[in-house]
Amino acid sequence: MRVSYLVVLLCALPVAALGQSAPKSDIPVIHYKAVGAWPKPLIGDKGLPAGPWNYIQVTSVAVKKDGNILVMHRGDDPILEYRPNGDLVGPFGDVKFSHGKVMPMQKDVAASGRKPDMSGYQAVYGAAGCSNCGAHEIRVDPEGNVWVVDAPSHLITKMSASGRTLMTLGTRDKRGKSATQFYLPTDIAFAPNGELIVTDGYGNDRVARFSKDGKFLGAFGTRGNGPGQFQLPHGVVVDAKGQIYVTDRDNQRIEIFDSSGKYLRQWEHVGGLSSLIMTPDQHIWTGATLRDLNGKPIETLPGGGADSRAHGGAMAPNGDVYLGLLSGVVEKYVRQ
């Protein structure tokens, strides 16, 4: 198996992802340490290591119910499965992501009032040389099914734990705002009652709700910067009470809604976050910072840098944290 080594940053990265992040103060002692060189290097000629992994834009990481780690990137073999120790298991799943590029959204940007230098998508989607440009997010639901988001195809796919396609949401290559369409979706989360919560995302600036079997239940949110509005809803998680937490990336905040989509409150000045991780004990990783459900920072990962560097991530049952970076690496942190 051959994995490309070309790494080019996404043309449409938000301004905040280039170094802006919320100031942190009085964050307690760090309980994590970084793991170097994860996953393990491939073995090359003569049994020698072939060098560290260097993917084309790691967009997300997920942890399967069996404990194995799924790494999503935009190169060949877009989903790779590893054991927690870093050994490669092999490619995962039968999903083929979009190879195409999204056409410039000049008219949409002008109509929305978005600034082209934010997430205005004036450039192609994905890195130069990417072969699976649509690979955007990967999540594992409570039953162990694997869900992947293909933004340019406007499609979300549900797979079994073995990688077999079970169901899709959206209509492939057909963008829109109907009950059966997305417009560049970004993430999916799973509510305690079984509902599916989708951030729909780059084009629609809304959050859509579906039943467990994929029936459209409704949507909430409009484009803007007021309460309950979005300028790119990019990541989403749901707590044990069914409250929905959405990263409003271009507005650099997290908005919280009840299970029906009613706006409740927001956390401001958190930077241009792309992804969230809900922990089993009901805390949220916002990039490299762990917060309680009131938004208070509890601790930060060592050397994690700006929270906005992480495009996606996951937490293992033993507390290990994995972050996927568009620079083409996976960062792993273990509890001390």
Language-model regions, residue ranges each:
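Eukaryotic scaffold repeat domains enriched in small/polar residues
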Residues: 20-336
